[in-house]
Amino acid sequence: MSVSFPRQSARTQRFTLGAPRSFRVADDGSRVVYLRTRGGEDPVGCLWVLDLAAAEPREHCVADPRDLRADDSQLPPEERARRERSRESAGGIVAFATDDGATVAAFAVGGQLFVADLVAGGARALAVSGPVIDPRPSPDGERVAFVRDGAVLVAGIDGSGERRLAGDDDPELTWGLAEFIAAEEMDRLRGYWWSPDSRQLAVARVDTRPVQRWHIGDPADPSTVPTAMAYPAAGTPNADVSLFVVGLDGHSVEVAWDRSALPYLAEVVWSAPGPLTLVVQSRNQRERVVLAANLDSADGTDTGAARAVNRVTDERWVDLVPGVPCWLPDGQLVDTADEQDTRQLTVDGRPITPAGLQVRAAVSVTSEGIIFTASQDDPAAIAVWRVGVGGEELQRLTAPDEVAAAAGDADTLVTVTRRFDQPGAVTEVRHRLGTFPVRSLAATPAITTRAQLLRLGQRRLRAVLCLPSDHREGDGPLPVLLDPYGGPHAQRAVASHDALLTSQWFADQGFAVLVADGRGTPGRGPAWERSVAGDLATAPLADQVDALTACADAHPGLLNLERVAIRGWSFGGYLAALAVLRRPDVFAAAIAGAPVTDMALYDTHYTERYLGMPDEQPQAYAANSLLNDAASLRRPLLLIHGLADDNVVAAHTLRLSRALLEAGRPHTVLPLSGVTHMTPQEEVAENLLLLQLRFLQDSLRVDITAPGQGAGGGAVASNRM
């Protein structure tokens, strides 16, 4: 019996189960460590090793939580928060850390600490008290550090000699954990770092007492006590974050910098070529400074004073780029700079990548060169590149029409590539002995995309058009569904087959589905990204309308512009609701999932980057709010929101619904009890797609026959109301 796409997508967690991920390459290139479940519908992550030192390279599983009798059904609250911030929906082993040689790995399952032998194989539980969060072996593999109850502890790699290194008795003062803003907006999911010599740790101390408390409850279970969380909404105080260096001997020193001027601790790097290095930002994010901490003063004392080694400013904002800063073995600093409308790699301030090559992330740095990812002529594609430290020998290592990521270095490089015309991903290890595949056990999607990459309108907007699988030339006109994200820091119009599967499923129900990336999206240069400064509404919405109009002009008779809907989640949900409120002449219906309706309710780091402080820019916040447009609603609007969402809290949807009710505007609200900003539950994920389809059919007055019957796979206009 065949399984429908909505059910298959839900069971496979959007086809991520069974795919290898989270790669770590041993310093000597002898092995690659990674996570993978045992099948495309198996949600339990296992730890695997590809042994490249064997006569015949082979992979083997070194830790399966089921064999270890590990139970992750009851996660510690801190671990639940970490998984929500990283959008992690799998179970079992979802994260691990290794020593420098990748001989041992540490991980936690259900708060229990395990250590795996990556050479001989096998894993064992350590007899330390829990719950354990974020365990990390020392670089020499002799010890393991971890967080428990907001304190940092260390033990021998066998679990012996457990002792606390840093902590407070106040639950609002935590050590070794990333605060909400760092994890949600800066992609910093950790709060402590081993020194290269394994004798010290740099530990973040987070004081959440200044932060307002919000409460996330479950209205479906009135006996449940709401959970209090420190949520820094725009214009309100952030957590106070500081950094200490703590020795195994108990000695500690605070790293000193001007935290009033540069309060955001965005990243910490502590690797052998360089000093303890911090990346800090001003509150308005127009200044980003790389600091080096002084831990070896002339008189033998550790002052902890930090000096600036690179400072970047911008009148709009300065972006954080993954993988930088880092240090070359000779002490030169690798960073990025925005010059000639290009994000370029720099070495001690000198650009080493050319104009037009938009750097996405640095992967690794050696004296021989730098591995990085970048987009060249097309933001829909990302390739892996290598460049010499002086800018010589620039070389693209993956195809120009793929979406690629990488781990490791030039000697042992893991590449993961996705193609527009091929489901899944291809993972390979490029080693001096040859190229070796890493198996994917992910399920094959039940549908295949019928899509074309487009450039639309005067701005050459990158877009994808998905048509019904059985569409024939001359069929139409088809009802249209716009399916964007459309905002900063994310793309949907990419050269990846699986990124478009849900859009294709809607197309197979009889729609022409258009996915367009407008101004503010990454990959097209700093000016393009910063064109939404001060206004997140006008340009993104105008670009969706322009993409629709240009697509219709390019395909006469294909699109029914009288029946156009739009759907989206998060910023895409905001954009969808915005579309029917401000352009009802274009959009006949909208589905807004987890929409940000009032920018003053969203977090500091994201919102203030684009709109400034609410008390300084009240007009910007008012102009970008959906609440003020409630009386303009004339079209069907479906609002969907998880009531347990702690990122875009349900108050966004509830406040818009209240404003619509007060204005006498009919609308539909679908509350999801127990659901966060993700929708990982199988039944919820499946039925949510089906309910959205029915809403579109009803709102656009479209009848859907069986697939393969009727124009374009079954969508025909109806006169019924």
List the predicted regions and their residue ranges:
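Serine-hydrolase catalytic core recognition
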Residues: 407-721
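Beta-propeller folds
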Residues: 1-396, 401-404, 711-721
